[in-house]
């Protein structure tokens, strides 16, 4: 971003570049009001320029070009520095969504002194001018990209500074400890009880625990917003695809009496009471595969099981348990910390399944009559506990960049603790604490890292 002058006035289309009812063009910078006054005329008095833009006011304006030819009738919204998104004077033009009008208006702004904005440059200016931090900027991008209600909510919480406040608390704690260390260094002769290595280590442990909580809570929030992974396993013709279709309430998977219809896994997203689930219908579970394709399908089914949060183990209740059923049960018993729901399918037929499953959560289902469907949906919902939703409402998520810094912060805290335990000189301990402070500062962008910042804003769309 440093290749662009922050003093420039920038303009960009904020809506898609296509024919539509309306289009919004945004302009920000010190010359925004001046440029707007050159091309904006009162719609009911086209010979009079609008040159007294007020804060948070709207104007019905006629846009005219340098030859005094009308371009469009628009709504002009004016917001004055510093109370804007960019903290700069900002003008927004709401025009008709003709590509001809969009091009003409953008060309007029550029001819009169504006510059076409770079990707994410409006958000970049909000960051540079202290309006938002890096974490908030990334949350704006996440909100734009969100594909479910929980993702949008989590992005808004983060955009409003939830993570930054947590990081600020950690850094404040470090700074308070540094003050004690520097006080001891500067006034060693003063006999006070304000400093001790034990007290310093205790404080490091608190900071460490807080970072660990941020990371672990983030994982739980991420599980919710990314979709709870549900793998459907079972032998061939147990009714896995029928269960898959029943949950979706539509015919997504091909259902057939021919063994091995599903060779690879199918996947779909579904929302149950606004909670996203990611369903995976897998290939039939065999003890012995007949060919390489079948073997690959079984391996992929196992991979889905390993990566899932919930496993739906489907058995044909109208048939005697066979070698493949027993093989599946043994596979499931070997898994650790898995939430498994056992389904006896075809409950509308005579029950013949004769294998006992110890301590199992078993649901009898008929995909023909839909009997048992409500119990299955309820069991899926029960996976999300009240504590999960409580954490979602109070905590936030971290992205890969933030997680990397937080994990590095944990390593740096261990160095601080080690040197304090071994009574290193306070100068050395203070140096390690400053490194820790800078690492955490990088999470919210309070420490400048130009290359990283440029990469973040380059991912934004133009006009944001």
UniProtKB/Swiss-Prot annotation:
PROSITE patterns per UniProt: G_TRME (PS51709)
Enzyme class, UniProt record, top EC level: hydrolase
Keyword terms of this UniProt record: Cytoplasm, GTP-binding, Hydrolase, Magnesium, Metal-binding, Nucleotide-binding, Potassium, tRNA processing
Positions with a binding annotation for Mg(2+): 241, 262
Cofactor annotation comment: Binds 1 potassium ion per subunit.
Residues that hold K(+) according to the record: 237, 256, 258, 261
Main subcellular location: cytoplasm
Annotated binding of GTP, by residue: 237-242, 256-262, 281-284
UniProt protein name: tRNA modification GTPase MnmE
Lineage: Bacteria, Pseudomonadati, Spirochaetota, Spirochaetia, Brachyspirales
């Amino acid at each position: 971003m440093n290749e662009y002058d922050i003093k420039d006035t920038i303009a960009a289309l904020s809506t898609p570049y296509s024919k539509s009812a309306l289009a919004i063009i945004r302009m920000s910078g010190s010359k925004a009001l001046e440029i707007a006054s050159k091309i904006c005329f009162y719609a009911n008095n086209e010979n009079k320029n609008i040159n007294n833009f007020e804060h948070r006011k709207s104007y019905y304006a006629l846009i005219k070009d340098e030859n005094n030819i009308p371009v469009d009738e628009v709504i002009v919204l004016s917001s004055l520095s510093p109370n804007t998104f960019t903290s700069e004077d900002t003008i927004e033009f709401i025009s008709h969504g003709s590509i001809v009008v969009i091009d003409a208006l953008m060309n007029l702004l550029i001819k009169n002194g504006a510059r076409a904005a770079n990707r994410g440059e409006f958000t970049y200016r909000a960051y540079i001018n202290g309006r938002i931090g890096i974490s908030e900027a990334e949350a704006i991008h996440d909100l734009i990209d969100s594909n479910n209600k929980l993702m949008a909510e989590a992005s808004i919480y983060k955009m409003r500074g939830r993570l930054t406040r947590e990081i600020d608390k950690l850094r404040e704690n470090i700074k308070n400890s540094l003050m004690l260390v520097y006080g001891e260094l500067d006034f060693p002769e003063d006999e006070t009880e304000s400093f001790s290595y034990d007290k310093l280590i205790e404080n490091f442990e608190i900071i460490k625990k807080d970072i660990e909580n941020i990371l672990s809570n983030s994982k739980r929030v991420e599980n919710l917003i990314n979709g709870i992974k549900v793998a459907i396993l079972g032998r061939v013709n147990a009714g896995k695809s029928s269960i898959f279709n029943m949950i979706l309430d539509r015919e997504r998977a091909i259902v057939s009496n021919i063994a091995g219809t599903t060779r690879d896994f199918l996947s779909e997203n579904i929302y149950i009471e606004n909670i996203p689930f990611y369903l995976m219908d897998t290939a039939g579970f065999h003890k012995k595969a007949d060919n390489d394709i079948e073997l690959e399908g079984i391996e992929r089914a196992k991979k889905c099981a390993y990566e899932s949060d919930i496993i739906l183990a489907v058995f044909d209740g109208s048939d005697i348990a066979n070698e493949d059923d027993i093989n599946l049960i043994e596979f499931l018993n070997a898994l650790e910390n898995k939430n498994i729901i056992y389904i006896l399918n075809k409950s509308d037929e005579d029950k013949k399944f004769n294998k006992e499953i110890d301590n199992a959560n078993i649901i009898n289902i008929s995909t023909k009559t839909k009997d048992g469907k409500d119990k299955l949906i309820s069991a899926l919902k029960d996976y999300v506990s009240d504590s999960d939703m409580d954490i979602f409402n109070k905590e936030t998520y971290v992205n890969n960049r933030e997680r990397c810094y937080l994990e590095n912060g944990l390593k740096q805290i261990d160095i601080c603790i080690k040197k304090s335990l071994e009574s290193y000189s306070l100068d050395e301990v203070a140096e390690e604490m400053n490194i820790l402070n800078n690492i955490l500062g990088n999470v919210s962008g309070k420490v400048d890292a130009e290359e990283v910042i440029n990469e973040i804003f380059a991912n934004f769309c133009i006009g944001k």
